[in-house]
Amino acid sequence: MRCKTLTAAAAVLLMLTAGCSTLERVVYRPDINQGNYLTANDVSKIRVGMTQQQVAYALGTPLMSDPFGTNTWFYVFRQQPGHEGVTQQTLTLTFNSSGVLTNIDNKPALSGN
């Protein structure tokens, strides 16, 4: 009888604590990287006054371009390391009607480490 009681108590205790895992970081979670991966060195290659072709050669194809034809390119990189928070890097490039780069907006700014 004592063995049955001990087994039942252990089973109940196991069920009650099953959702309270303190070993969350033991479970493998892969890093999820999406978009255009750019380093600070890549961003430093572009300058106001470059053409769209020069920018595309330096950085590659943008993830998105403005669908309304205002000549805006978006390079977005989103990273979610396994057990950490999500970070997002957005580089927005604006061109004039001649296809010349007029504005660079880098949020949050990449810093060379």
Curated annotation (Swiss-Prot):
Signal peptide start-end = 1-19
Q: Name one GO molecular function term.
A: identical protein binding
Disulfide pattern: none
Residues with S-diacylglycerol cysteine lipidation? 20
**Phenotype seen when the gene is deleted:** Mutants show minor defects in the assembly of outer membrane proteins.
Q: Where are the transmembrane segments?
A: none
A GO-annotated cellular component: membrane
State the compartments where it is located. Answer: Cell outer membrane
Keywords (alphabetical) are: Cell outer membrane, Lipoprotein, Membrane, Palmitate, Signal
Q: Does the keyword Nucleotidyltransferase apply?
A: no
- Which topology term describes how it sits in the membrane? Lipid-anchor
Family matches, as InterPro entries: BamE, BamE-like, BamE_dom
Q: Name one GO biological process term.
A: Gram-negative-bacterium-type cell outer membrane assembly
Q: Which residues carry the N-palmitoyl cysteine lipidation?
A: 20
Function, in words: Part of the outer membrane protein assembly complex (Bam), which is involved in assembly and insertion of beta-barrel proteins into the outer membrane. Nonessential member of the complex that stabilizes the interaction between the essential proteins BamA and BamD. May modulate the conformation of BamA, likely through interactions with BamD. Efficient substrate folding and insertion into the outer membrane requires all 5 subunits.
The record's subunit annotation is: Part of the Bam complex, which is composed of the outer membrane protein BamA, and four lipoproteins BamB, BamC, BamD and BamE. Forms a subcomplex with BamC and BamD. Monomer in the periplasm, but is able to adopt a dimeric conformation in the cytoplasm. The Bam complex has the shape of a hat, with the BamA beta-barrel crown in the outer membrane and the periplasmic brim formed by the BamA POTRA domains and the 4 lipoproteins. The intact Bam complex can have 2 BamE subunits.
Q: Name the protein family.
A: Belongs to the BamE family.
Return the HAMAP family for the record.
OM_assembly_BamE
Q: Which PANTHER family match?
A: OUTER MEMBRANE PROTEIN ASSEMBLY FACTOR BAME (PTHR37482:SF1)
Q: What is this protein called?
A: Outer membrane protein assembly factor BamE
Its source organism is: Escherichia coli (strain K12)
**Top-level taxonomy:** Bacteria, Pseudomonadati, Pseudomonadota, Gammaproteobacteria, Enterobacterales
Query: Gene encoding it?
Result: bamE
